[in-house]
Amino acid sequence: MSTDWLLGLTHRPERPGDIVAASLSLSVAERTSADQQLLAWHIEAAGYKVRHVPSTLPDIFKTKAMLDWEYASQQKERLTVAYKAMQEQLKWLSSGVSDYEIAIPIHELEACASGTAYYKGLDKSIRDEQLMFIANECEQMFPRLRIFLFNAHKLFSAPVTIFGPSLAVIYVGQCYLSFREAERVKSLSGHFDWLVREATIDARDVPSYIRGLIK
């Protein structure tokens, strides 16, 4: 990612510091507070399409059992807050105020199904329940929810969410980089469109594909 891409210096008359302040901001991604920030961004994008590439499986579709496992080393209060935030985000999605597109690398679902990589040691019943929940939600909410699966051997994407035409957010672990400059948002939207065009599994076929992973 070049400095010119971040700042748009070649086409902007403002001072670099002013450009950064206007187009780029950082938000701490501590899990519970980040969930509240994400919900606020989703609400802000009401009426616009939201596009999302998650870092693992989509948080918005994680079951309580999956969150219990992920938060095993955290305080119980954090799990409670996180689960409530996920429910609020799912309620927002179910309201139909915005179309939602998600692009997921196929290997993430395969790893969950087989209990390998990130999901090593996670009980099969929890993994199966998680996959079935995603498949069911994807089927019930189609077409306002569309999930596309891509081959990470051919395509790559950092975790990113584009909230309509005015905001794009990249997740970098400890913080979120958020962009509000139109050209930066447009560029990331184009990146997501590329993932969709090159997807191996189309949205219509995702529910049956996921169910086929459960053995």
Language-model-detected regions and their locations in the chain:
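Surface-exposed acidic, glycine/proline-enriched linker/cap segments
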Residues: 31-41
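Compositionally biased, low-hydrophobicity segments enriched in charged and small polar residues
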Residues: 24-31, 101-103
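Residue-level signal for secondary-structure boundary elements
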Residues: 18, 31-32, 200-204
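Hydrophobic protein-protein interaction segments
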Residues: 42-214
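Basic, Lys/Arg-rich alpha-helical nucleic-acid-recognition elements, primarily the DNA-binding modules
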Residues: 1-24
